């Protein structure tokens, strides 16, 4: 048979690039005789040695041969280079340029959007989204500028996503609210196949009430300290930016918050609590609430500890019943518990009936007030009860807790059978003088003047 050269065809997959960005090129040699020696590939003038698959030659019915070879290569590897298929037989060489599998160039549409002023103020940061839509080929470069200067951080660009033969991507810029409201210009710059597009957006000129976070630490309740093995410390952070992190430490040791960060009463506040042992609190150890956020140059810290009290004063407890005519004539009567002469001011007062806790809605405690010499404090509590309950012989106790009390708790109990013709019961410390007893009696006497009005208020409530 007479030798004949191969006819070469360059092939390109009609499918768009795979999700990994790879392309498939084909080289088909037909109608040649005798068989060819080799099929190879080049990118410009550089040999390609990977991604190749050459199939065995096939003898056709008319006595000639056909052979094919496939090249798989990524779009980024091809770039702007040209791909060639080279066929050899002895000293003869045939070369075929393969069509561009990347398709036509399509430059992207670039759109900038921003979060609303209300969202920026509440979250304490602005979000600018640069949407890069419908481009081909896949390779792009995205950068951000602030007032014309390149930014090195504060933005994240997503991987490209291919749909229907084109690609899309997004780049998200985050700007602290304090900086956003200074009228700076931010630019999203997109480069694609030698063409650069820029889109600008200007921060708002509206002033922002973006004050620094403020930390307020709350100690445990005195009732917790006196009655429980663990106590709760509370950290309230106002003016808190969105995504703020609150943690606790004791000296250099991190503490685990028992309750995660949660919204406070205000939209821009968060609350974090931690449980510690009562013994640790009473020891005077220092506990820190640490507030951290990307907008803060350094974390904010505030500390709390139990202050040492040297001049402890134990309270005296006195109880007054409504006047006798009220007991007989009214459906409701009142008991008043006066607690005085104590220091420091932290104290709790509550009531029980027959050793069961009374609903706090049935009694009213006043604020703790300083006595005349300002060296001690007093408080009183007014309990409203039904006359028939009192007549049944129920026992009512005023329960007082204070750190100066040896057993931490004082119970003062009265009932219908208590022996007191003037309806006043007084329990005093042994150190109390006759003058103290007299002052207590006088205070209770004046309180009794207002009992009818006080009981009425409690009933209305």
UniProtKB/Swiss-Prot annotation:
Residues 206-308 are annotated as: CH3. The keyword Membrane applies. It comes from Heterodontus francisci (Horn shark). InterPro entries: Ig-like_dom, Ig-like_dom_sf, Ig-like_fold, Ig/MHC_CS, Ig_C1-set, Immune_Resp_Modulators. The chain crosses the membrane at residues 438-458. It is found in: Cell membrane. One of its GO terms (cellular component) is plasma membrane. Residues 1-99 are annotated as: CH1. Signal peptide: none annotated. This is Ig heavy chain C region, membrane-bound form. Keywords: Cell membrane, Glycoprotein, Immunoglobulin domain, Membrane, Transmembrane, Transmembrane helix. The keyword Nucleotide-binding does not apply. The lineage of its organism: Eukaryota, Metazoa, Chordata, Craniata, Vertebrata. Gene3D superfamilies: Immunoglobulins. Its main location: membrane. Residues 100-205 are annotated as: CH2. PANTHER family: TAPASIN. It comes from the Eukaryota. Residues 309-418 are annotated as: CH4. Glycans are attached at residues 164, 200, 245, 275, 374, 411, 415, 437. It is a single-pass membrane protein.
């Amino acid at each position: 048979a007479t030798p004949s050269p191969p006819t070469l065809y360059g092939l390109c997959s009609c499918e768009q690039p795979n999700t990994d960005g790879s392309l498939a090129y084909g080289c088909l040699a037909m109608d040649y005789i005798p068989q060819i020696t080799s099929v190879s590939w080049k990118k410009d003038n550089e040999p390609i040695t990977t991604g190749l698959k050459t199939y065995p030659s096939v003898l056709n019915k008319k006595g000639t041969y056909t052979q094919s070879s496939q090249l798989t290569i990524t779009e980024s590897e091809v770039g702007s280079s040209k791909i060639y298929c080279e066929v050899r037989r002895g000293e003869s060489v045939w070369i075929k340029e393969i069509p561009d599998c990347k398709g036509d160039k399509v430059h992207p549409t670039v759109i900038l959007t921003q979060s609303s002023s209300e969202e920026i103020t509440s979250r304490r940061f602005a979000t600018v989204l640069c949407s890069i839509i419908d481009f081909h080929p896949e390779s792009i470069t995205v950068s951000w500028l602030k007032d014309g200067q390149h930014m090195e951080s504060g933005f994240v660009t997503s991987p490209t996503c291919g749909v229907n033969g084109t690609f899309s991507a997004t780049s998200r810029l985050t700007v602290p609210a304090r900086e956003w409201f200074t009228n700076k210009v931010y630019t999203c710059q997109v480069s694609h196949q030698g063409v650069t597009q820029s889109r600008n957006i200007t921060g708002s000129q509206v002033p922002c009430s973006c004050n620094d976070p403020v930390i307020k630490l709350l100690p445990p309740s005195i009732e917790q300290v006196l009655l429980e093995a663990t106590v709760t410390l509370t950290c309230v952070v106002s003016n808190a930016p969105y995504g703020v992190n609150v943690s606790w430490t004791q000296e250099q040791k991190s503490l685990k918050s028992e309750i995660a960060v949660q919204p406070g009463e205000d939209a821009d506040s968060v609350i974090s609590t931690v449980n510690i042992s009562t013994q640790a609190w009473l020891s005077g150890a220092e506990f820190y609430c640490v507030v951290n956020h990307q907008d803060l140059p350094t974390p904010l810290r505030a500390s709390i500890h139990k202050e040492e009290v040297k001049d402890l004063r134990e309270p005296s407890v006195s109880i007054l019943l409504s006047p006798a005519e009220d007991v007989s004539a009214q459906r409701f009567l009142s008991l008043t518990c006066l607690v005085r002469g104590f220091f420091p001011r932290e104290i709790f007062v509550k009531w029980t009936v027959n050793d069961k806790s009374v609903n706090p809605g049935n009694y009213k405690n006043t604020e703790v007030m300083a006595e005349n010499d300002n060296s001690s404090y007093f408080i009183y509590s007014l309990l409203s009860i039904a006359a028939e309950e009192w007549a049944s012989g129920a026992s009512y106790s005023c329960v007082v807790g204070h750190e100066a009390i040896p057993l931490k708790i004082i119970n003062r109990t009265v009932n219908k059978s208590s022996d007191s013709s003037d309806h006043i019961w007084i329990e005093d410390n042994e150190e109390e003088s006759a003058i103290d007893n007299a002052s207590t009696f006088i205070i209770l006497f004046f309180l009794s003047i207002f009992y009818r009005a006080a009981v009425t208020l409690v009933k209305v409530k």
